[in-house]
């Protein structure tokens, strides 16, 4: 990297910047503004080619959040280097399995954004088969677990929950639905949902139940056993940002920081984007 020591001492490192963008992208109210910003999306694309695996994984989580907004998908797909970088992550032999699955999921979403149903289905199946080939037989198809989390009632609790989930080996991505205290988690098929519950229980302030549908289609809450489950730690991921560094500490501030006030709010995104652009060439 060609950033000088003095520059790095005055500015946050690449991982911190990507983590902050990921945190902002976790809030649905921020997603359009981030994608419309001229520098953030290119910065995240550059992040996918970063030599530090945690930077790549965090950037993919941010992109996964952004892709949940349908209005963002066409622009994301057309952004220079987006699809090629996702392919590179999927095909690189040194990429961790969870990161490959996450990149494949984003690729599927963007690739199907403007295709006919039949073409979309065929392309997604082809992409999944290719991803599975590179993942190997131990990482079979991912599954989705919906959790109702008692105590998930503010941003600080969400950050605690994120920290716990990010440490679990086998977690691919997750999305919070704060209004109904839920978290939708994509995990490897060989990871048990009980591991998620144990990790959330380790926060001491939250408890998870699984949301399932009955035969009649009604949703039911199924409690997990109180017996702790041994969780395999994901040692490749970094410690989560401390609360005082998180730009989403308060929702209204996060929104204004993104785009409500051009002279103040958008400047943080511009600073972050400029830093990413300067730092990710090596």
UniProtKB/Swiss-Prot annotation:
It is found in: Cytoplasm; Mitochondrion; Mitochondrion outer membrane. The keyword Transcription regulation does not apply. One of its GO terms (molecular function) is metal ion binding. The modification Phosphoserine is found at residues 189, 246, 260, 267. GO terms for cellular component: mitochondrial outer membrane. Residues 246-255 have a biased composition (Basic and acidic residues). The modification N-acetylmethionine is found at residue 1. The modification Phosphothreonine is found at residue 137. Keywords: Acetylation, Cytoplasm, Membrane, Mitochondrion, Mitochondrion outer membrane, Phosphoprotein. The keyword Transcription does not apply. ARM repeats lie at residues 39-81. InterPro entries: ARM-like (IPR011989), ARM-type_fold (IPR016024), ARMC1 (IPR016617), HMA_dom_sf (IPR036163). It comes from the Eukaryota. Residues 239-261 are annotated as: Disordered. In association with mitochondrial contact site and cristae organizing system (MICOS) complex components and mitochondrial outer membrane sorting assembly machinery (SAM) complex components may regulate mitochondrial dynamics playing a role in determining mitochondrial length, distribution and motility. Interacts with mitochondrial contact site and cristae organizing system (MICOS) complex components IMMT/MIC60 and MICOS10/MIC10. Interacts with mitochondrial outer membrane sorting assembly machinery (SAM) complex components SAMM50 and MTX1. This is Armadillo repeat-containing protein 1. It comes from Pongo abelii.
